[in-house]
């Protein structure tokens, strides 16, 4: 693969994944804008529930990324039979997590909400939302595992089409049911949950139909789920367990923002919701870069050319730096127009503006270290580095410092947000060293007699 083919392969995946992430997050942004117009308490309740969804999504990402790391290397070798074994493993784990979470939320909804806020009104709104949204978990798991499998074979277009469909369906139903338009009942947060559930069911159904009808390499049969290959299971878990730690820590770190700010006041929760949704949308560019880099790096390792992998890693880092600077500037200039779409109190609006000013600077550093770590290092098969780095930063720096500043020192919400994101600055140095001077390339595939 020459440089032209490398850039073509990377940007073809990158652009589709970024657009998919933007459309997906647009669903959440539209939900928040509509719920923000409906009421600040409703917005805060759904925001708290979404932290549960975020933690759940992090677990699915771990199993999905483990699948992609393996499958992309087998994809480089054009061996498809081992890929099916890995995909079936990941799917079983994803479904198991969905069932467990559904059971826990069904039995302990209020206790789950208490982890994120102590405000009784917010808890009541959140429980109403949870009552319906819990039914999305199984459909979401199947969809995410199938999309990860397709991504490992450089197929990403279907993900974008599904996201656009979900955006249209979810926003349309939400508009009707949240506010009670066109003679429909006014359901508030329950209406928002119904819209999300409908979109998730349609996503899952259309994707399964696509895989059955169109996918020639990864079409799974029932027998694929019944087979047991203990060697593949050990290999898969060896990669996935550190990813679970990594994604779990990242989920906890993100949820801590809601936990810490949620115990300040409702204005801080609403401001964080508005700011974080815009930040996450711009962050889609970095997330897409990491996902595309992971597939390209894994595929190249599977082809067996280590010098080519090193050269591509250098080129990718330059792209990540450019992405960080342009993304930070973009976030700075769009913050006011986007915030004006929200019906926030003056206090919440002022806080949201402060948060976004801080996040504009954070973005510059995040857009380098996160894709370099999650795309190059992790995509190369070295997963424990990220787990160790995040464990150190989150457990020893971010959480203790943020809790101290919020609850002991009585710091302002803006200063607390700085503390919650301080790891994005710290991690740049070890990530740069690891990519350029450390060892991170690992061949994970096994020699097999099974023809692809």
Regions found by a protein language model. Give the residues of each.
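Transmembrane helical elements of multi-pass membrane transporters/channels
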Residues: 12-31, 132, 143, 166, ...
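Transmembrane alpha-helix boundary and packing residues in multipass membrane permease domains
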Residues: 17, 21, 32-33, 50, ...
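Helix-terminus/linker motif at the lipid-water interface of multi-pass membrane proteins
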Residues: 22, 26-44, 113-120, 176-187, ...
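Short runs within selected transmembrane alpha-helices of multi-pass transporters and secretion channels
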Residues: 64, 133-152, 159-170, 192-207, ...
